[in-house]
């Protein structure tokens, strides 16, 4: 037999961005509780609004199933005395398990006999267990929390009401003075209390009180109303998943409405208008069918269609004030030159241990010019780098960016173009912030890519130099994002930048600038490990086998595009018939070469058989060809070596008693192993 179960936590309005994650957390905690208590159920449904977190468990069993439990006791030699009677240890075990001594049996595990018991456990009634769900509710955690009144509990918002029902029965418990009942609350202004007679009545009972408890249904209602408005007005209202998710969790009964603003505000940069509407007011911007921004907006009301005109006028008034402020800020920004703005950066501290923004920009300039040298850029390009790195943070002191931090870079590009900077420099000002997320867009220009890499590497290494690195989930300065972004940009451009050398040179530069809390060798090692870990994430995203990832990162991690190519090519050919014997042969070379002693060079005159000469000849050809080969051809070259390597080992005793011959053979294998290890640590690859 089964019944439905309903748990609703009624709250004061939660921040919209935490509603979905909170109800999913509640679902998981209830699911875990059910599994831990071995209570069967069909399905769990979740419902959420800004004022409630709810789970409805369908067909929850009315009692736990009876079950047989086993328990292991002491070893037989301890359980029996010399006369074969039960020892105190055995009798104590039986008592602790609430069974009679005659119920004890023996079972052999790995050659040793132990006492075992089997006992039937009668399942408890679900109603006897459900009150412990109080601990599930109070154990929830949130990014932001508060306590209220004299209560010790910290929660996302004060708990105002609770429902816990198993069928028609109310499950009694109390949290912060609020007792469970079968009564919920409707819309704050349109609804009344809602009595829930059965858990399955919950959605409809709340709908009668102007609450759509299903977040997906609220979202769909908003989308449908937006589409209707588009058709009616011949507008475009572009899809914005983040904004749609937020407004869905801001309202309980959504009604879409439109408003207008003065056309003169269209003279503001489009990004300023859109950001004002979206970020400050949670409005949807409106476009023509040709993609032109129009002097209208769409918002979502938490209510019905009554007095929509009045609501629209109120929203227009608020937006008008916002746009007036934005227009003032923009006009003020146009009065200052870029160089005047740059001068103010010397008064802004980047970090107390790393100096001002001006000092950071100077360091980034050195890094960017260093990278340009590695990439063989021309002098004209370097002059662009110098101008760019002298100004690229200037928009941080503008009024618009002060009001809308998310427009940094975008406004820099616009102001730079207005003041006559080269388009390439203006674009790079915007692009140096990219990517803005793990999967975000990358810079599309060479100059933007270079400055983005330089800025991110300088930030990363600078913080490591002053002993500030991510710990666990804490990364307040976004260093993982910086490293990941730099690696992605390098990969996308296919730039063979010697990262180990670059890291070392940047560390030396940072120390020369005064960032000296850790020895250079420690910083270099930590940064290299950190970058390798970011590479692991990228390779995992390419669905590369973990053993192959270990192999290529253990090889030469210097040139990032080549490393990623090596991983992809090894992964692609891992199922080929020749792959396993090739890896085994190469691994054998590497393992034996570890016995090589420094200083010994290969002397062909000491070869005793044709197989040594054949391997030497192949190695000499490999030396000549290797640098010019594509990555896939390097792997093919190793595969072609396999028969020569096998023949060599079949006919040559490397560890001979003759030290001169032994060392000469080890020297030959060591030279070959150096090429193999540069490609990958082949012994990390699983070919079993």
Swiss-Prot record:
GO terms for MF: arginine-tRNA ligase activity; ATP binding; glycine-tRNA ligase activity
GO terms of biological process kind: arginyl-tRNA aminoacylation; glycyl-tRNA aminoacylation
InterPro entries: DALR_anticod-bd, Gly-tRNA-synth_bsu, Gly-tRNA-synth_heterodimer
Broad class of where this protein is predominantly found: cytoplasm
Cellular location(s): Cytoplasm
Keywords: Aminoacyl-tRNA synthetase, ATP-binding, Cytoplasm, Ligase, Nucleotide-binding, Protein biosynthesis
Disulfide pattern: none
A GO cellular component entry from the record: cytosol
Assembly description: Tetramer of two alpha and two beta subunits.
NCBIfam families reported in the protein's UniProt record: glyS (TIGR00211)
Annotated HAMAP family: Gly_tRNA_synth_beta
The protein, known as: Glycine--tRNA ligase beta subunit
């Amino acid at each position: 037999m089964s019944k439905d179960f309903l748990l609703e936590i009624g709250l004061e309005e939660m921040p919209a961005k935490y509603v979905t994650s909170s109800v999913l957390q509640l679902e998981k905690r209830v699911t875990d509780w059910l599994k831990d208590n071995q209570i069967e159920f069909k399905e769990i449904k979740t419902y959420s609004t800004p004022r409630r977190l709810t789970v409805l468990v369908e067909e929850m069993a009315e009692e736990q199933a009876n079950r047989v439990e086993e328990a292991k006791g002491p070893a037989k030699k301890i359980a029996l005395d010399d006369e074969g009677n039960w020892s105190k240890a055995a009798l104590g075990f039986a008592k602790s398990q609430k069974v009679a001594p005659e119920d004890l049996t023996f079972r052999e595990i790995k050659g040793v006999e132990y006492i075992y018991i089997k006992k039937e456990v009668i399942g408890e009634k679900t109603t006897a267990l459900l009150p412990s769900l109080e601990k599930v509710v109070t154990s929830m955690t949130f990014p932001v929390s508060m306590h209220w009144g004299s209560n010790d509990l910290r929660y996302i918002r004060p708990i105002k009401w609770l429902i816990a029902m198993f069928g028609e029965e109310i499950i009694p418990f109390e949290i912060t003075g609020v007792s469970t009942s079968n009564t919920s609350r409707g819309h704050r202004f349109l609804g009344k209390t809602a009595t829930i007679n059965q858990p399955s009545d919950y959605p409809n009972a709340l709908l009668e009180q102007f609450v759509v408890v299903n977040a997906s249904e609220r979202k769909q209602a908003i989308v449908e109303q937006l589409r209707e408005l588009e058709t009616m007005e011949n507008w475009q209202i572009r899809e914005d998943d983040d904004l749609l998710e937020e407004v869905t969790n801001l309202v309980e009964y959504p009604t879409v409405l439109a408003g207008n603003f003065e056309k003169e505000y269209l003279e503001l940069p489009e990004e300023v208008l859109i950001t004002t509407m979206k970020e400050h007011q949670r409005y949807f911007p409106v476009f023509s069918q040709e993609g032109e921004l129009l002097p209208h907006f769409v918002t979502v009301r938490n209510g019905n269609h009554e007095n929509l005109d009045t609501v629209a006028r109120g929203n227009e008034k608020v937006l008008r004030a916002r746009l007036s402020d934005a227009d003032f800020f923009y006009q003020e920004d146009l009065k200052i030159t870029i160089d005047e703005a740059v001068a103010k950066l010397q008064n802004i501290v980047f970090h107390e241990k790393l100096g001002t923004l001006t000092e950071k920009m100077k360091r980034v300039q050195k890094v960017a010019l260093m990278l340009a040298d590695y990439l063989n850029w021309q002098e004209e390009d370097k002059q662009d780098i110098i101008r760019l790195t002298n100004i690229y943070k200037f928009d941080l002191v503008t009024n618009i960016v002060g009001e809308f931090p998310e427009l940094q870079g975008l406004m820099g590009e616009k102001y730079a173009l207005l003041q006559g900077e080269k388009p390439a420099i203006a674009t790079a000002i915007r692009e140096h912030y990219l990517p803005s997320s793990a999967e975000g867009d990358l810079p599309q220009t060479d100059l933007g890519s270079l400055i983005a890499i330089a800025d991110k590497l300088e930030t990363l290494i600078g913080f490591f130099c002053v002993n500030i690195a991510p710990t666990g989930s804490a990364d307040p300065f976004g260093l993982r994002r910086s490293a990941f972004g730099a690696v992605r940009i390098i990969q996308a451009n296919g730039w063979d930048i010697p990262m180990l050398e670059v890291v070392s040179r940047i560390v030396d530069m940072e120390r020369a600038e005064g960032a000296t809390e850790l020895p250079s060798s420690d910083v270099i090692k930590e940064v290299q490990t950190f970058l390798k870990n970011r590479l692991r994430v990228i390779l995992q995203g390419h669905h590369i086998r973990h053993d192959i990832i270990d192999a290529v990162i253990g090889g030469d991690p210097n040139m990032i595009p080549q490393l990623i190519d090596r991983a992809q090519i090894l992964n692609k050919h891992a199922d080929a018939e020749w792959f396993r014997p090739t890896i085994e042969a190469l691994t054998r070379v590497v393992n034996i070469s570890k016995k090589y002693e420094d200083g010994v060079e290969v002397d062909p005159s000491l070869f005793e058989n044709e197989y040594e000469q054949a391997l030497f000849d192949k190695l000499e050809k490999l030396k000549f060809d290797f640098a010019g080969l594509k990555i896939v051809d390097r792997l093919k070259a190793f595969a072609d070596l396999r028969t020569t390597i096998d023949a060599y080992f079949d006919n040559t005793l490397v560890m001979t008693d003759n030290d001169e011959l032994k060392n000469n053979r080890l020297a030959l294998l060591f030279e070959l192993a150096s090429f193999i290890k540069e490609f990958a640590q082949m012994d990390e690859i699983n070919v079993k």
